[in-house]
Amino acid sequence: MITSAAGIISLLDEEEPQLKEFALHKLNAVVNDFWAEISESVDKIEVLYEDEGFRSRQFAALVASKVFYHLGAFEESLNYALGAGDLFNVNDNSEYVETIIAKCIDHYTKQCVENADLPEGEKKPIDQRLEGIVNKMFQRCLDDHKYKQAIGIALETRRLDVFEKTILESNDVPGMLAYSLKLCMSLMQNKQFRNKVLRVLVKIYMNLEKPDFINVCQCLIFLDDPQAVSDILEKLVKEDNLLMAYQICFDLYESASQQFLSSVIQNLRTVGTPIASVPGSTNTGTVPGSEKDSDPMETEEKTASAVAGKTPDASPEPKDQTLKMIKILSGEMAIELHLQFLIRNNNTDLMILKNTKDAVRNSVCHTATVIANSFMHCGTTSDQFLRDNLEWLARATNWAKFTATASLGVIHKGHEKEALQLMATYLPKDTSPGSAYQEGGGLYALGLIHANHGGDIIDYLLNQLKNASNDIVRHGGSLGLGLAAMGTARQDVYDLLKTNLYQDDAVTGEAAGLALGLVMLGSKNAQAIEDMVGYAQETQHEKILRGLAVGIALVMYGRMEEADALIESLCRDKDPILRRSGMYTVAMAYCGSGNNKAIRRLLHVAVSDVNDDVRRAAVESLGFILFRTPEQCPSVVSLLSESYNPHVRYGAAMALGICCAGTGNKEAINLLEPMTNDPVNYVRQGALIASALIMIQQTEITCPKVNQFRQLYSKVINDKHDDVMAKFGAILAQGILDAGGHNVTISLQSRTGHTHMPSVVGVLVFTQFWFWFPLSHFLSLAYTPTCVIGLNKDLKMPKVQYKSNCKPSTFAYPAPLEVPKEKEKEKVSTAVLSITAKAKKKEKEKEKKEEEKMEVDEAEKKEEKEKKKEPEPNFQLLDNPARVMPAQLKVLSMTETCRYQPFKPLSIGGIIILKDTSEDVEELVEPVAAHGPKIEEEEQEPEPPEPFEYIDD
């Protein structure tokens, strides 16, 4: 056994090259044991490597590399490993090889990423030897079937060629595509590179044996390529694959922005008829109404002459199909279907509201109860509670009246067809001026009904805002207009709101500043930013500044690194409200990206800024960035939740609520629990609201603490000595927990994994209730119906059942509160004589004997009852449209005997097109009527009598 390498090292000084080679081979064998000794002579080994004439210089490099590895000098070790060429065996499982490969990949990745950001002429050449090792690694991954590893490294090193090759060579191409798409959505932080990856994915999806159009369109939404989506839809219609086209349209509406959808609609409209065989005949630009009618006629004539044998009666069909697709893309269909689902399945427990109403004693809690009622009935059109308590409701005055009127917009969310009739009583009239608070609230309500789906109502609100003579009406009008025109970037709307902002009126300006951001949502419009930031730096009104702070952030929604320059300048501003705007801008620009740089910035501000509002906003913003990985949030904010600063604690609570909304995350709830007993009342308020955001729609089985929190809300509300702020939080929490008749959840991403824009905006503006209660209503934008709605080829709901393969109690509605029984008045005990006492004693003994005879029968009956209660089925059949919670989707399937087949997996949920495999007549689900005032009935007057001749006697 060798105890020293000195003898071998001395051979390196020999003249004979063979002896040196022999020494190197021996050293290579013992280097792991004697590296310390060899390191003293490593310069000799280096000299051998540098000697061009030495035959085994690669071997010298390998030995030198191993010595430097043991010394911890990884960079030198990597350089010599590269010099060793093929002698460095990437397939070896030693710690040395693993470490050097990791360093090699890191070094290569760094060079590739640096090169990617440089223009073509300035790119630095990459060491071919380095690339060689990385290529060997890729091959090793493919040989070992470690495809996910290869995809990960390929994306990190920006090697799209390897990325594509890996997917195509894998044994599960659809699985690898889904994995890659998920990586793109959640982990990729560079927008330009992400787009290149998506282009590759689109190419692979399209080249599959059976092209996966649904996923292609998901990629195209990310790429912001509406033209390609329109082309796919046209292609599907031409190929008579209508059901697939409808399914894609529903998915697009759920995931894409309004601008994207309107471009697709525009392209579909300007195509004439999809049958036209002339390639490239798509005319762009808006076609005026008169020409539109004549246009298709020309194309029909052309096709008739060009394509012989085409039947003329086939031409109107595609037009009808295109109209249906436009109806779906515009959101009209989805909104109608969700409204039907929410009305049909409304399961609100009015007892909760009644108890709260009886317990509240001041105007703040009165407003909170009105808001909670609107949350509980969001989209159900049921204003039963308000009708039953008109006298109580009438106590709302001034801005409370504004909030109460606007709450009708939340209750009737999506009830667009009768919106103007429903709200007629509250809207501004030409004849007599009504209450300004009521009219402003009415306009705000119209915006809430049509949020992110304005259509014709935008022009109505535009005119109302133009003609408004009162700052309160202008406030409501601006909010309503901002909501209805959300993300449209319409210039006329922007100009009118800007005019209202420049009037320098605090009340109008606050709403106008926020509305400007809503209209320009995610547009990154330089002019809008310049106008808004410029005015924010000039104005003296804090209210206007507050509105603009959120508005500026909204303009940068989803823009990621493109917003960095603006964020930098806002964060350096001396005005704390603009610094707060910087925090919101980080939240909006990087929402859902999990970007480390953004998180670091927010955490730094959270502990270093001198202003409490800025620190609170910074911590809240963490929730928006981390919502794709809610399990990470508790560890990020756990220390902040114990901060000495109550504003930071409040921010931590809200961040947990935003990030883990609807998940029932146990760690988050464990962090919030002690905060519900915080010595500072507004921290308790935040903890109560956040707990409801997390536990919305959770049951005792999915989240054991839900009932404990329900009781806590009730305790806080009914405690006469508790603080108003905590009570406000508890009342709102009750409303959030049972929102939408127990049929909605809150989720910041769509079912397909895209960031859900209305939800993000709704939650951000909701957090501003800290300054302005009426903004609480914005949370209704984030409510997503938890449903599976199956549709047939005519886009009607057929009668069909889904099978939920778990016990019904797992996802059941919570049991309603019991009406407390009235206590009987205690009777005063009367004096009893000794004789009567004896007589009663005898009677009792008689009864006892009789009871003993009866006992056996009754005991048997009791046992029977218990037996009946015991067995709970392991599955449940749900009727279409079905309430299916996100966690329940995994166990959902069609029944075995079902005649319908879904076009995409039921586990995704939402609106699903069903293919009918039977020729029998379909049974359809009857639509239900919406609630609310029925104005039409009142307007029907009796017909005038028949004309007759009046003869005077």
Swiss-Prot record:
The family database entries (Pfam families) matched by this protein are listed as: HEAT_2 (PF13646), PC_rep (PF01851), RPN2_C (PF18004), RPN2_N (PF21505)
Its GO biological process annotations read:
regulation of protein catabolic process
Q: Which residues form the signal peptide?
A: none
Chain coiled-coil ranges: none
PC repeat residue numbers: 403-436, 441-474, 476-510, 511-545, 547-580, 581-616, 617-649, 651-685, 686-726, 729-761
Residues with PTM N6-acetyllysine: K310, K720
What function does the entry list?
Component of the 26S proteasome, a multiprotein complex involved in the ATP-dependent degradation of ubiquitinated proteins. This complex plays a key role in the maintenance of protein homeostasis by removing misfolded or damaged proteins, which could impair cellular functions, and by removing proteins whose functions are no longer required. Therefore, the proteasome participates in numerous cellular processes, including cell cycle progression, apoptosis, or DNA damage repair.
State the protein's name.
26S proteasome non-ATPase regulatory subunit 1
Q: Which lineage do the record's taxonomy fields give for this organism? A: Eukaryota, Metazoa, Chordata, Craniata, Vertebrata
